[in-house]
């Protein structure tokens, strides 16, 4: 073995290792279908969660009703399991959840005090605002076409 063969091998291994660092890549993008535990005041406002909408279950079946007052109709198709679980460690006098997506989406939230549905809070984007009790909330994001998946961000903010 020549004197130069060993150092070249180390250099190649170091270059390959430096080019592939899954930890660094994982930190740059927010996880899809992430859950959150938050307290008042929010430490990061807005808090952003990402996901893919849709599924095969009608929103009215997830919600157990066709509409919730005053937030709106329980439309769209969703997965059986919630897309996100958000735990509030304290009461929020005002909290806003708004979905942003390139296409029309729907939302269902189940938690302390009931179930809320929404379709077109901000244009074609669903959202729910108001007073929120401490506890665990399950959140579903739906699509109008069965089994259609659409990328979205869920923004959680105390800002009006």
Residue ranges and their predicted role:
Residues 20-26:
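Sec/Tat signal peptide C-region and signal peptidase I cleavage site
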Residues 84-101, 107, 137-141:
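Hydrophobic beta-strand segments within beta-rich accessory/binding domains
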Residues 9-19:
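Bacterial N-terminal signal peptides
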Residues 65-94:
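Non-catalytic, beta-strand-enriched accessory regions in extracellular/secretory proteins
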Residues 1-11:
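Bacterial N-terminal signal peptides that target proteins for export
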Residues 27-66:
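Predominantly extracellular/luminal regions of secreted and cell-surface proteins
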Residues 27-30, 156-160:
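Intrinsically disordered, low-complexity, charge-dense segments enriched in Lys/Arg
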């Amino acid at each position: 073995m020549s004197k130069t063969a060993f150092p070249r091998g180390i250099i190649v291994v170091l270059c390959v290792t430096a080019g592939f660092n899954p930890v660094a890549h994982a930190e740059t993008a927010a996880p899809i279908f992430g859950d959150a535990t938050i307290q008042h005041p929010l430490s990061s406002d807005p808090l952003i969660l990402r996901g893919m909408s849709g599924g095969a279950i009608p929103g009215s079946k997830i919600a157990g009703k066709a509409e919730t007052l005053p937030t709106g109709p329980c439309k769209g198709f969703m997965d059986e399991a919630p897309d996100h679980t958000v735990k509030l460690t304290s009461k929020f006098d005002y909290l806003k959840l708004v979905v942003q997506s390139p296409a029309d989406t729907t939302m269902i939230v189940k938690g302390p005090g009931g179930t809320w549905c929404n379709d077109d809070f901000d244009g074609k984007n669903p959202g729910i605002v108001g007073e929120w009790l401490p506890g665990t909330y399950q959140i579903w994001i739906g699509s109008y076409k069965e089994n259609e998946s659409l990328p979205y961000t869920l923004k959680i903010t105390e800002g009006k």
